[in-house]
Structures are given as structure tokens and as C-alpha cells.
Amino acid sequence: LALHLPAEPVALEELVGRVLAEDVLARGDHPAFTNSAMDGYALRAGDAAAGEVLDLVGESRAGAPFAPALAAGEAVRISTGAELPEGADAILRLEDASEEAEGVRALAAPAAGAFVRHRGEDVRLGQVLLFAGQVVGPHEVAVVAGAGHARVACSRRPRVAVLGSGDEVV
């Protein structure tokens, strides 16, 4: 009779109903980099008073970030999920801006941090996502997959036998 079952690696597709033998840790920060939560313009909030026109100097798209640092009075067109350029601290939403020949006009002043998702604000590297002893359901499988694990350590399933001996069960 074993009181503690040994651990074994279990693939994602076989996890439902299993018991975690170890804590599941985040393998990286999520989001992995500071990015925009909205389509709009990345800028320095202090430069964007309502009515102010900023120089439009480029674009930052998912997978193709704007490389140079943003200077005072500059803005960069940005897509949702795209990396924030260095020096930017806010997003001016498309609906709060007007693109003009001389640049982009702020129709409303964004606050510092507006519509910005910071690196690691959801999950930090090494953060415990699921605890040892937890029974895995579909939600937990999604957490494991989202954390980048293909397999996790689970307690081996117990083997149970029923032995019949005459009229009694042992």
C-alpha cells in the first residue's frame, strides 16, 4: 500500500482529471512586452494637450515595432498589441485624434498610462499559476498551455484491485 504516488510527466491532452504533483510556474512575463491596448497613436502624455498637433514619425505594428525612441512632440501610429516605442507612455485612441497634413491632433488629452498594457502586468516569470494537489479540469489545461508547458508532473494514478475470496471481499 503506497501512501504517496510517484510523479509522472503528463501531456496536455491527458491532463483532465489528473492531480498536479508540483506547482505550475509561469515560464515568462505576460504580456511579454509593454504594448498598446487600442489602435491609435503612441506618444508622451505630457505632449498631448487637447488641440495639440504632434509630428507623426512612423508606425508600430504587431511584429514590426517602431525602433527609434520617441522624442518630445512626436507620435507613432500604433496597432492593438504592438510594442510601445521607447519614450511613449500613453495611447491616444483613434477616436480621440484627427490625422492632418502637419501631423496628428489630440482631440482629448490622454493620461500617462492610458491604454498601455505593461510587461508582466498579468503574469510574472516564476509566478505560481496552479498549485500541487490541484485536480486539473479544462480551465487548468488552458492555463498550463498558455504558460507554455507541453507536459506537467502529475501524481501517478492509483492501481486498485478487488480480490474475491469466497463469500467475502478482501
Where are these regions (language model features)?
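Short, glycine/charged-enriched hinge/interface segments at domain edges or termini
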Residues: A42-V170
